């Protein structure tokens, strides 16, 4: 985990983190855990009637992968804000890859502030989720 941002420069790109490929089992387990039983995520016939070729992943499942990856880099108490938009659907077999880079770095009083660009893409580089995160570290952290 990063505690010291002194050496981080704007445009620094953190190593990517890859998540497991999306499976039907993963979607079923997430539906059970989240209570989101929308049939577009678990019923292939429903998905096909909606014009899709198969079920699609829950947007918040993809968001949870982004959050998990971010907390692997920065402790959760330092993450002050996450703002994302869902750009495209994530399909069965897609492998979510978390990307993060430094947009801005600022030191103000005893606070070290980072604005990050975050995204989830798939194995082909197609963006699924895009946004920003704000990190705040104090001199005491």
Name each region found by the language model:
Residues 1-16, 91-141:
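HotDog/MaoC-like acyl-thioester-processing domains
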Residues 1-55:
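Catalytic strand-loop segment that frames the active site of acyl-thioester-processing enzymes
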Residues 48-57, 61-103:
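Hydrophobic beta-strand-centered segment that forms part of the acyl-chain substrate-binding groove
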Residues 7-8, 43, 67, 72, ...:
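Hydrophobic alpha-helical segments with strong N-terminal bias
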């Amino acid at each position: 985990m990063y505690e010291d941002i002194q050496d981080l420069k704007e445009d620094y790109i953190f190593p990517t983190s890859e998540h497991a490929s999306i499976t039907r089992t993963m979607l079923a387990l997430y539906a059970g855990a989240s209570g989101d039983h929308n049939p577009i995520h678990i019923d292939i016939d429903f998905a096909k009637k909606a014009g899709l070729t198969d079920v699609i992943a829950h947007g918040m499942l993809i968001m949870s992968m982004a959050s998990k990856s971010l907390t692997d880099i920065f402790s959760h108490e330092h993450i002050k804000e996450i703002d994302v938009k869902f750009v495209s659907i994530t399909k069965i077999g897609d492998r979510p890859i978390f990307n993060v880079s430094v947009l801005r770095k600022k030191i103000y009083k005893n606070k070290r502030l980072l604005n990050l660009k975050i995204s989830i893409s798939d194995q082909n580089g197609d963006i699924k989720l895009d946004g920003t995160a704000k990190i705040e570290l104090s001199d005491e952290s």
